[in-house]
């Protein structure tokens, strides 16, 4: 619809120029938006204002000239000039009816597009160290990353999902030491357990498992070798749990990429040597430093310590070089908000390598405040007591968890109330939206049982010309906006845009259903309304699918 209006405007502007009503045939880009207030029409454009400088005319005069020369269009009821020169368009009801045909035809592809033109995009998300179970913060990142990937794919991008396994470095060594010390305790040895080791019962459970498998054998090895064995075993056990928890949350990856493989393949050392040759890495105080300040970071960063051990930054450089070497047009990382300071140094590495940092995006996911009946849930990472992703899914279910994690922009902190997530009332957003889908499924079954529809008939063939109630036209307008909403969500990388849309559509349907019966004594009117609610059901399902939430037929 926006494209049709754009062509109407441009056609009118060209004819106005030909008639001498405009001074230039160069027309700058315009915006066409749905106004906030219904009184301002269905669409509004700033064409006259952005053309004022080129035309050297007052915007309202430009608007008058364009409107006077526009072709008549059967779906435009009237146009108005508002304020400094906005052109407002009021559409006839019949303008919205073709949306129903399109929804029936496209079905589960309605809302999809070629916006991404097949460009290759990698979305790397969660990527938690395999040193403990995924917690509530990881859960929000998982919901965001997976939804972003779904939306980009639906919008025509070729998307790859990846999990980066931090299976090398100090934290893995600390994990191994933590398990080894717990195992020693289980062997009856007196050991001191440092506070910087990993706490929590899961460490004791891994130690007990390892004790049962090879406790005697381990006890005969020197500590360094025993710690290394414990580290590998523990990381595998934890990673297996992470995989299972993510699958239960509806998240699956195309690739799990090991940090250790970067060292084994020599890619880390190769990256360091490449940057040395570019004079981007230099030596100072026995360490090797990356000139990140040259590329916009606040200071230079160490890549190899004076003891010869590489930093995490070194492997991160190699990893991001490897990503671009795989041919991705765009790389998106989903990080916790506490990694904000890391963005500039990765951008610096990308720019220094000769690649383009504008092809690299970081989504920073803010913290989750976990509540129960409005009261904070106590958590302590130091004591190892925290609410895991598995805990949340077990208590409230995948659908409620994902939907609530996506209910606000990831730029903002989120209050997640476990009790609200379990409610089967309109106070629970996921129930509010899913209930629309289930209710319409019930309406369609009733329509078949009452012979309003044939069982084999697609419920979209009704007479839509009978849809004239204000609530019906409002629903049609909301349905027509879904493709643009998906495109906006893809362009901004903000999945909460889909959440907000679904809540609005659900609210409009509930309002309509409370005022009007779908199945009435008038069979033709009933069939028209069935076409409408079937379209609502389809779009609710498509939107929920993008967020990784199911659309139940019964509730």
UniProtKB/Swiss-Prot annotation:
Return the EC number: 6.1.1.19
* Catalytic activity reported: tRNA(Arg) + L-arginine + ATP = L-arginyl-tRNA(Arg) + AMP + diphosphate
Return the HAMAP family for the record. Arg_tRNA_synth
Q: Report the top EC class in one word.
A: ligase
Q: Which keywords describe this protein according to UniProt? A: Aminoacyl-tRNA synthetase, ATP-binding, Cytoplasm, Ligase, Nucleotide-binding, Protein biosynthesis
* Pfam families documented for this protein: Arg_tRNA_synt_N, DALR_1, tRNA-synt_1d
Q: Which residues form the signal peptide?
A: none
User: What CDD domains is this protein classified in?
Assistant: ArgRS_core
Q: Name it.
A: Arginine--tRNA ligase
As for family, the record states: Belongs to the class-I aminoacyl-tRNA synthetase family.
Please give the subunit comment from the record. Answer: Monomer.
Q: GO CC terms for this protein? A: cytoplasm
List, alphabetically, the InterPro entries matched.
aa-tRNA-synth_I_CS (IPR001412), Arg-tRNA-ligase (IPR001278), Arg-tRNA-synth_N (IPR005148), Arg-tRNA-synth_N_sf (IPR036695), ArgRS_core (IPR035684), DALR_anticod-bd (IPR008909), Rossmann-like_a/b/a_fold (IPR014729), tRNAsynth_Ia_anticodon-bd (IPR009080)
Short motif ('HIGH' region): ranges = 128-138
| Gene3D superfamilies, sorted | Arginyl tRNA synthetase N-terminal domain, HUPs, Isoleucyl-tRNA Synthetase, Domain 1
Entry's localization field: Cytoplasm
